[in-house]
Every structure is written in structure tokens, then in C-alpha cells.
């Protein structure tokens, strides 16, 4: 099933710009095995982006963090990389309840 990671990062160019970057980097994200379960901004602060991402393993998380090309694309889209917090979720969880 992979590893779920809750993420939070500051974005400075709006959600639309960030989302367009994600779609443009589809091949790179697939290369790392990344799947977005959720991505959206905080209702009272649109500069705070929250995500839930699925990675195949811890090595993929590290590869994502170390990918200089992808990091540069994220910066260009307004992501403040140094503000990022990524929290791996334990194996005890459920999703899409009650579906």
C-alpha cells in the first residue's frame, strides 16, 4: 500500500500555479512513485498548502527530497522549500470511510 505522508508547505504564487506545476511534473512524480491523495490550501490562509501523499517506500521519500530538478520547479511555482514539513503516517490508518 505504501507510506502515507502528511505535508505542509508555504506557497507564494497561489494554488493554481502550484497545481499546474504538479501536473507538468507528472512524469517526474511517477518516476518517484508519488501519488497525491489530497492537496489543498488552508481556508483561512491560502498560502498554507496541505497535502497527503503516498510513496512506495522511505527511499522514494528521500529521492523526492533530494531531486534538485523537481525542487527547482517547486520553487519556481512558489513553494517555500525551507518551510516544508513532511510527517510519515503510521501503518495504522484508514481512508475513504465510509466508502
PLM regions and their residue ranges:
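Short S/T/G/P-rich N-terminal loop/turn motif that feeds into the first structured element of a domain
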Residues: 1-71, 82-99
Amino acid at each position: 500500500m505504501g507510506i502515507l505522508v502528511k505535508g505542509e508547505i508555504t506557497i507564494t504564487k497561489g494554488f493554481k500555479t502550484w497545481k499546474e506545476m504538479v501536473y507538468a511534473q507528472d512524469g517526474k512524480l511517477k518516476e518517484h512513485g508519488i501519488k497525491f491523495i489530497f492537496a489543498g490550501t488552508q481556508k483561512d490562509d491560502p498560502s498554507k498548502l496541505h497535502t497527503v501523499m503516498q510513496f512506495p517506500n522511505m527511499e522514494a521519500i528521500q529521492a523526492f527530497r533530494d531531486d534538485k530538478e523537481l525542487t527547482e520547479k517547486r520553487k519556481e511555482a512558489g513553494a517555500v522549500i525551507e518551510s516544508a514539513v513532511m510527517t510519515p503516517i503510521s501503518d495504522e490508518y484508514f481512508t475513504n470511510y465510509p466508502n
